[in-house]
Structures are given as structure tokens and as C-alpha cells.
């Protein structure tokens, strides 16, 4: 899906951010994991990932043409990282299950992801499950503490997303999954754009994460995805006006329509 040159460009754009070596703050983020958030504001190469035709086609088919980019982040698992708690990505809206997905997640493999280096684990068919909590699922304490062992959540029905560098996997937001344990001697890097229906609040506050002067230089579809758009009939307006009109007024010389 991604050429070696594109993968190299992504690595180069991420390098200064990964060099800071900021590790996760809790069990969910991962004590031995780098997470780089707000990628849309950091390099045009990440906007290109968010609007990649195949990923976007899945998002629009599942979520509608007014879908939004909920988050865009890099996840870099270091050797020794343990398994993440089980979770599903569109849980933030707290709409009871079973239900249609309110989001989808794309997983771009920048490194080869293998059974040994922390390939994402998924439970096939779990997007159809009801609201029962499974063994090893994320709990509120996972966002406040480090050091928990979620190995008791291992399941015979789970599979690992083994993917060569440059490949793409897409899952519904209702699918139970978790980051795997990295038992190798090298980090494992992926980038995950997450999309949501146009009426659900985004995980990342894109209005603050992507300054207007940066948004004005993005491709038009990327601007729409971060919120310079309208969910019918008028959700997302600014003082009764389409947000793209205000962006043109605030950055008229930079806007690339």
C-alpha cells in the first residue's frame, strides 16, 4: 500500500518526535510505548495518510460522507512492552451495544509487525457482541496506574495482525482488540488514523491540535475531516456560517482550495 519512499518519509517526519522518547503515562498508553499525538499538525505526510483513498473509502462507506478524523497518532512499542488491556475504539460515546460502529480504525504498519514484536491482537466477530465486559478489558484504573499485568486476558479466539511494512488493516470501532507484547529486540511502529461519525465528539480536539494557519495549508478533504465541515443539516457551523468560510477569511493567502 505504501511505497518504501513514503515509509521513509514517514519515519523522517516522526524521528524528532520519537527522539524525545516520551513513554506512556499509564497502563493503557504503555509504560514502554511512545505515542505521538496530533500528527495532522506535524507534517503533510500524515495528512496524506488520513485521506488515503482506500482508508477513506472504508470510513465514508461505514460512517457516511460527513465522517470526521477522530485521532491520528503514532504508536511505537519498545522491547519489553506488555499486552495492552482489551478495548474497542468507539467506546467514548457510551452508546449501548450491540449497535452499528460509530467509528473505524486504520492501522498502517510502518515497521513489519510480527507475532513477536507486538502485532495488534483482534477478536474476530467481537464487533457484533453485546455490552458484556470481557476478561482483561480496560478499566478506569488503567488510565491512572502503571504496572498491571493483562496477560490474564489471553484468548484462544484472538488473532494477531501480522503485517509487512507499508500495509494497512481496517477494523470497525466496535471490534475488541489490544496492542500485543513486544518480545523482540526492536521497536514496532504503526500509525493509526481513527474516524468517527460526524455527530460524535472526536478523541483529539482538532480545533486546538491543528492551528488555523496549519489547517489552511492542508488538502481540502483533510480540512473537512478535522472539522472544517458540516454534518447535515448544520452541525458544526460557526455563527451560522460554514467553517471553511471563516478559515478563508483568517488565512486567505495560505489557503489551498
Language-model region placement:
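Residues that flank catalytic or metal-binding motifs in active/ligand-binding sites
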Residues: 32, 42, 70, 102-104, ...
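Active-site region of the double-stranded beta-helix
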Residues: 65, 79, 92-100, 109-119, ...
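Short, solvent-exposed loop/turn segments at secondary-structure junctions
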Residues: 2-4, 74-77, 113-115, 127-128, ...
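Conserved hydrophobic/aromatic beta-strand scaffold that supports enzyme active sites
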Residues: 1, 85, 105-109, 122, ...
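Non-heme Fe(II)-dependent double-stranded beta-helix
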Residues: 1-97
